[in-house]
């Protein structure tokens, strides 16, 4: 069982009401005239379907790709409750899926808060999947009342997941992109047992 399978039990699930980031994202995409209506979409690192299920309400078809089977089981359970039957789930890493499907194309490639893109090959594959690409990632700093004192004590900082990230790759390759930074605050409290 991989780490993400373990996280599935407590991972955020689909909510019919859009959260703050989803509202801001869909408004921003609408201002860019990006539509999901009748599109073929791949959602890379889809997790439990927090975004997938909203996209599926408009999409012609959507491929939900994730390396954690437990996440996909939750997505399928919620899709069934919503009577959405245009979602196909595949339990593979992005790298393996690309090796198996090197020539597959979609109208839109979507990736949200997923560590699926690890290197330049992944970035290139993502960019070649579709005409429209949407990538939502962590900007950088994440505050933690638990971790911040530890970082301070050891005179270090949170390194982030993407110090060499897609944005730098796009800049290096002189590829045009739109960028917006959303500000979100989440408060998560865990028991001592959950934190360990």
Please annotate each region the language model reported.
Residues 149-164:
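Conserved Class I S-adenosyl-L-methionine
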Residues 96-103:
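Short conserved loop adjoining the S-adenosyl-L-methionine
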Residues 160-196:
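Substrate-binding/catalytic lobe of Class I Rossmann-like enzymes that use SAM or dcSAM, i.e.
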Residues 50-85, 90-96:
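Class I SAM-dependent methyltransferase SAM/SAH-binding core
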Residues 131-142:
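Conserved beta-strand signature within the Rossmann-like core of class I S-adenosyl-L-methionine
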Residues 116-129:
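A short, conserved alpha-helix within the catalytic core of class I
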Residues 1-35, 38-47:
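Conserved class I S-adenosyl-L-methionine
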């Amino acid at each position: 069982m991989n780490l993400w399978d373990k996280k599935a039990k407590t991972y955020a699930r689909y909510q019919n009401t859009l959260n703050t980031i989803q509202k801001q994202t869909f408004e921003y995409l609408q201002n860019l005239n990006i539509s999901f209506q009748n599109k073929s979409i791949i959602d890379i690192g889809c997790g439990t379907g927090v975004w997938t299920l909203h996209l599926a309400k408009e999409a012609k078809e959507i491929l939900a790709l994730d390396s954690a089977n437990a996440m996909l089981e939750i997505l399928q359970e919620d899709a069934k409750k919503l009577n959405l039957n245009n979602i196909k789930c595949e339990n593979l890493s992005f790298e393996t899926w690309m090796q198996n499907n090197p020539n597959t194309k979609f109208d839109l490639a979507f990736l949200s808060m997923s560590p699926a893109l690890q290197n330049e090959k992944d970035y290139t594959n993502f960019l070649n999947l579709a005409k429209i690409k949407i990538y939502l990632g962590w900007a950088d700093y994440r505050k933690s009342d638990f971790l911040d004192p530890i970082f301070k004590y050891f005179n270090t900082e949170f390194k982030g997941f993407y110090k060499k990230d897609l944005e730098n790759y796009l800049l290096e390759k002189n590829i045009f992109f739109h960028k917006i930074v959303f500000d979100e605050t989440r408060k998560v409290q865990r028991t001592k047992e959950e934190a360990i």
